[in-house]
Amino acid sequence: MKKRWSILSAVLCVALLTGGCGTGSKNDAGTGKEQTFRHETREGNEHQSNLDVLQPSAYGNVQGLNLEKGSSISIIGRGSSSAYWKAVQEGAKQAVADINTNLGYKGNDKVKLVYSAPETENDVDDQVNILDEELARYPVAVGIAAVDSGACEVQFDLAAENGIPIVAFDSGTDYQNIVSMIDTDNTTAAATAASKLCNSIGESGQILVIAHDSKSTSSEEREQGFVQEVEKNDPNVTVAEIWHLDDLDAISKEINADSSEKNSQETADNVQKAEEENADSRDTQTAQQDAIKYLLEKYPDVKGIFATNETVADLVVNVLDSMDKTTGEDRIKVVSFDGGEDQMKLLEDGKIDGLIVQNPYGIGYATVVACARAVLGQGNEATVSTGYTWVTKDNMNKDSIKKMLY
């Protein structure tokens, strides 16, 4: 097994005190274009169509991945409760199951998978602590969807010193020694969303961008890809404001400065409460919805909203419902990333106009394959593209689309 980490305890104590953060340049986005998952499946895996679109195709199978008996792979996500993250887990589990079947491993000989994620989605400190715990278990490889692209450098250095490769998936990291990045081409996908939204509002007017956080590369790439497309091809459309769900403190100060009216003060109080150290998820969700409502009141002429993931989309639709802006003449158009069951219902009900549906199952599967390839010294592509497609109410019931929903 790997050599013991004689410096582990001391260094991790320092990491906890300093926050374990580092800086560097962002990983480049992938190059995959919009794809529709094929309807055909191979015997034994109903999700084979999710694997057929992976580029390169080698990441859609486990042939030649002869891992040692009892090997353990750690996969660390940014969440675990949403449909997206459940699909990532499912894909990763299937890859490990395929490895065990292919090698004939049973019982204690099986290759093992441990999936972990912050209790509260996108909790940076919790994810860093999880990474510490997983590294202490001596996995053969780690796959991580980094909440904060600048965090975990100390932990990654420790992993490198002990021969544990790190694969990034979904959202990249600034760390320079990542062996592969498994993700959607967020920049291109967001540009597709921008083009569709601008077209739906008549290529003129104001729109808002609501992003899931200000730290992850997935959020940054989607934001940039969307804005760049608008600026390049839709000169009569204006991005009125970009707001991140974790920017509650800044918007609280703005609300307080903007008005002393009762409703605005209540909104500011809710936002401030969510910023408190022990605030629960309900406080945070209420504050985020209040902030979105404030932005819509600040920009009364907004005609469309881009939500960068399903969490944001749910918040946006809840607010629009409360303001009677999901139907009728005052309806505000919404496009979003992700395609879980709840979002498909919103799409069917006409409360969301279009979705960039990713391939989380393929992301999970390919991440395990990349981890195994790294362990075996087989080499990896710097970027593995997992595909996406544009889904609307008009095409959501097509067989080729249904195969990629989660």
Where is each model-derived feature located?
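Positively charged n-region of N-terminal signal peptides that target proteins for export
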Residues: 1-12
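A residue-level marker of the well-folded mature domains of exported/periplasmic proteins
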Residues: 3, 22-406
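N-terminal non-cleavable signal-anchor helices
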Residues: 12-15, 272
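C-terminal motif of bacterial Sec signal peptides marking the signal peptidase cleavage site
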Residues: 16-20
